[in-house]
Amino acid sequence: MQILKSVSELLEFRNNCGGSVGFVPTMGALHNGHATLIKNSVSQNDDTIVSVFVNPTQFLPGEDLEKYPRNQSGDIKICELCGASALFFPNADEIYSKDEPLIIAPKRISTILEGATRPGHFDGVCMVLNKLFNLVSPTRAYFGKKDSQQLVIVQNMVKRFFLNLEIVPCDIVRESDGLALSSRNSYLNDDELCYALKLSRSLMRASNLIKANELNSNIIKSSMSECLEPLKVDYIAVVDRNFEPIENVEIGNSIILVAAYVGKTRLIDNIWI
């Protein structure tokens, strides 16, 4: 596996790729969820490029940019074990200039839920991914369903900008107890890890209600809210795959999402119905 630390090194590597190229963009602190994305890419492409870049434009003032977990040696090891061809560590000064053109995410979907709590976040996501897609020129790019709102926004960007790549959604990876894997889980102490399970358990309750033919969104959200106590809940939402709110769950076309604070750490989770 090659370690690439500049745009010129990346472009040279990419020019020598003869077949399909899979791309896994990350912010590092890689875990088994990322490993699944990388393995999926390795199995479906001739070469796989992973990027690690803690993108400053998607963090708001006061968010955890400086505290965001970083583990370069661990990231390298995971990428090697998963069979990645190259690992790209961009430099922010190369990625961004002082006179940066703006890319604005679609207003409706980028200003609700995650976008309401983190205004401008998805603009930063679109900005960096547009640059990385142009640099890597991947055949396919891999994204986890855990960040489902981001996934839908990226799919929209690829379509609207006529980018020649396939976005491959990958299922959420969970611990054996149901906790969705997240780099931010490293912030949690043992007691908080127990409370964090309330997110996945609230979604399991929603799933069980749906299996019992309860499809009313308000009833499902109310039951989830009870399950989440005493956490500080940011939102509970039932939407279709275009992130339009729906009054009743539509089997095969719905996402149920939750965001809540466990201590000072904000966690998200969802299930696709």
Swiss-Prot record:
Catalytic site positions: 34
Primary localisation category: cytoplasm
Transmembrane regions listed in the UniProt entry: none
Domain of life where this protein originates: Bacteria
GO cellular component terms, A-Z: cytosol
Catalytic activity: (R)-pantoate + beta-alanine + ATP = (R)-pantothenate + AMP + diphosphate + H(+)
GO molecular function terms listed in the Swiss-Prot or TrEMBL record: ATP binding; pantoate-beta-alanine ligase activity
Note: The reaction proceeds by a bi uni uni bi ping pong mechanism.
Subunit text: Homodimer.
Function in brief: Catalyzes the condensation of pantoate with beta-alanine in an ATP-dependent reaction via a pantoyl-adenylate intermediate.
Protein name: Pantothenate synthetase
Organism whose genome encodes this protein: Campylobacter fetus subsp. fetus (strain 82-40)
